């Protein structure tokens, strides 16, 4: 038994300069796991609650000392003496201790940090990498793959201070044979895009996730400069590299309309889906995330009907990594993919359940970071250990993003051919 002998919580900083919760779980035998909770900017209304202190005299109210006290107090007391390898049991203890639907008593940030730290400690006690331990928890031991990265190289929306409405424009190096090659391709395109923007007299400052954030005349212009960069870098758009969007449409949904203030256009629900389809007809866009508001289920049905057979339609704010909401989506044929974010649901066990449910229904699962990150690279191990096939972890700069890519490089080196990189086959509608 990997007996828990101590649980420690502390307040640390995330990549946006805001506090977050870090936890350590100590086991008999000297094994220790440490993990930190990430934090989102564009958040779904049904996400598990990130507990903040609200004390304006500290960190402008964003402190997490209450959540940290919960880790060092009731959570620690409840977990002492328990077996760290019994992940589902540990997570259930914390969920029951909280007793709320959205973890607003103890805080999803407190519960998640401990949940992930326990998994890391358990892996250490077993003498195996975290991805291997996750595969065992997932009921898929030894089944691995390297994820296709969705690299967020141009930012708008809530992730940038510019006039571009769509939140993320991403490249996917689907033509690569290995993850290492995919990363190189993405980096070359990123640096080429910087030159393209600079030569046009556009800003090369970066947003929260490391993508460039220039002011552009339209969302189509963003796709055009990316196309130019891909081709200048020596790659073929549509073959070597495909495109993906995260609209984060809930952020510009007002009074039943989709208001693209940056380019002065307003759409009704079906009109915005038609607009996205027109972009996908012009460019090789193979994945669109949150293409409509989280509450616009009729609109999602239409979007799935007109694009779902050829394009991966990813629910982020729509599903918030929640199996209850995902069940409704599956039953109604809404979207065909789910974005997976640990902190939307608040524990490793519930995260794995969402991935399993998606896969069993023929939906893809895209593992994702948040805009507020730390050096914690657990999502890299999650992507490989569940053979999810896709990962979103930002651009090719900022160490909080690159930490995940570097961990994937290490894992690929360890696993070799046991973790294939399958490219386009991983993306819904493209196999």
UniProtKB/Swiss-Prot annotation:
Residues holding (2R)-2-phosphoglycerate: 167, 341, 370-371, 392
Paired cysteines (S-S): none
PROSITE patterns linked: ENOLASE (PS00164)
Localization: Cytoplasm; Secreted; Cell surface
Binding of Mg(2+), residues: 246, 289, 316
One Pfam family of this chain: Enolase_C
Cofactors, names only: Mg(2+)
Biological process annotations from GO: glycolytic process
GO molecular function, one term: magnesium ion binding
InterPro entries on file: Enolase (IPR000941), Enolase-like_C_sf (IPR036849), Enolase-like_N (IPR029017), Enolase_C (IPR020810), Enolase_CS (IPR020809), Enolase_N (IPR020811)
Main location: cytoplasm
Family from the record: Belongs to the enolase family.
Subunit structure, interactors included: Component of the RNA degradosome, a multiprotein complex involved in RNA processing and mRNA degradation.
Function: Catalyzes the reversible conversion of 2-phosphoglycerate (2-PG) into phosphoenolpyruvate (PEP). It is essential for the degradation of carbohydrates via glycolysis.
Protein name: Enolase
Gene responsible for this protein: eno
